[in-house]
Swiss-Prot record:
Keyword vocabulary terms for this entry: CBS domain, Cell inner membrane, Cell membrane, Membrane, Repeat, Transmembrane, Transmembrane helix
Encoding gene, per UniProt annotation: yoaE
Periplasmic side: 35-48, 100-124, 171-184, 228-354
Family (UniProt): Belongs to the UPF0053 family.
Stored InterPro entries: CBS_dom (IPR000644), CBS_dom_sf (IPR046342), FAD-bd_PCMH-like_sf (IPR036318), FAD-bd_PCMH_sub2 (IPR016169), Integral_membrane_TerC (IPR005496), Ion_transp-like_CBS (IPR044751), Transptr-assoc_dom (IPR005170)
The organism of origin for this protein: Escherichia coli (strain K12)
Membrane topology category: Multi-pass membrane protein
Residue ranges constituting the CBS domain according to the UniProt record: 304-363, 367-427
Superkingdom classification of source: Bacteria
Protein name, entry field: UPF0053 inner membrane protein YoaE
Organismal lineage: Bacteria, Pseudomonadati, Pseudomonadota, Gammaproteobacteria, Enterobacterales
Amino acid sequence: MEFLMDPSIWAGLLTLVVLEIVLGIDNLVFIAILADKLPPKQRDKARLLGLSLALIMRLGLLSLISWMVTLTKPLFTVMDFSFSGRDLIMLFGGIFLLFKATTELHERLENRDHDSGHGKGYASFWVVVTQIVILDAVFSLDAVITAVGMVNHLPVMMAAVVIAMAVMLLASKPLTRFVNQHPTVVVLCLSFLLMIGLSLVAEGFGFHIPKGYLYAAIGFSIIIEVFNQIARRNFIRHQSTLPLRARTADAILRLMGGKRQANVQHDADNPMPMPIPEGAFAEEERYMINGVLTLASRSLRGIMTPRGEISWVDANLGVDEIREQLLSSPHSLFPVCRGELDEIIGIVRAKELLVALEEGVDVAAIASASPAIIVPETLDPINLLGVLRRARGSFVIVTNEFGVVQGLVTPLDVLEAIAGEFPDADETPEIITDGDGWLVKGGTDLHALQQALDVEHLADDDDIATVAGLVISANGHIPRVGDVIDVGPLHITIIEANDYRVDLVRIVKEQPAHDEDE
């Protein structure tokens, strides 16, 4: 027991424990990679069994100290190379590491055996355990030989190995979880395995590669990977601040081969969607899906029929005037008002109004039996759907905070917001192709314009819902006829406008430089 009082013994023990743990970290990473080939229920068992068998093997190697020392004696010579037992172990161990690392890299780069898709094939339990033992033997051989040269007491060496292995057993599961959550770390560690395997093969042929070179390369790579993980964490934190709806829409549109949403970026660790075959999804399908996914983020002002385009019946007019208005209009439903649009009495079908006129019934009395459903302009389109269901085929009047009518919304307006425009008989399309540009009404929904012209993120302010609002915001005031306003890639020329609003514009889209070269 006197040797236990020797400080050099404890210093040697501590040094060996640290050495075994440091040299065992890369071993643990590769054990985690091998265990991932097994079904989830067997991974912990394989990891513990493999490390336990490796511990027994290390203790056995330490017990053969005298024999291991003789491994440096040459056994035979081939050409100018002399091979000892240690050289052969290094050579074949290095070849095994090179083969294993190359195979793993190929499988991961080809995306094999790592997807949770249909029919994932798992490796045999004992095959993986055997590979873990062999891998540990290759990694531990150099450390064991180093330990023999550092300490003269076999019990001290065995104690260091047991302590280090206990630490490895405790750290194996958290490290495995970390490796599985970070695919780039796996590829980095496999590249380390290639370097270590190459150094072992070189040493087997008698070419000594200073360990400092390997440790410097590994350390530098680890620092770069740490920066990569920090950047990825910051990226995920930034993405988490974006609306879940925007991220979901981006993923679905990318899956269908459409353009991604503005401000939504991609994580390099996440695979890009598979190429979409030509014609797999029609442009109309992409348009409608985009409309559905972005419906909740849009304003009622971009969906509704604006105040200036509402056809309404003035109850104060004569019978003949009302009849003429009803017969000349393609609409089947009218708001009945008293003198002005803001004085709404009710919503009545044209057929009922014509019958009332023939029978001499007061139009206002008929309208008062069907009061209008009024919603604020701040209501989002998703909640509007419930209001339209309760309206039972009627439309909904949209007002501002002062009760002034801003427009009306019908079920058809919601459908147009999703599937595109369905103009009435008395309407012209909101967007018309005109040579190398487009004629666009001022009240056109900004989202519809972006879809039709294949542009994104024209307005920074979410309150801007129409083309007129866009040009007024960009210009700072209501522009005059002939003014040209540039918004992103669009050159907008004012065609019709007055002191209060913009009615018609002509838009020319600037083509990207690479398109012009083509």
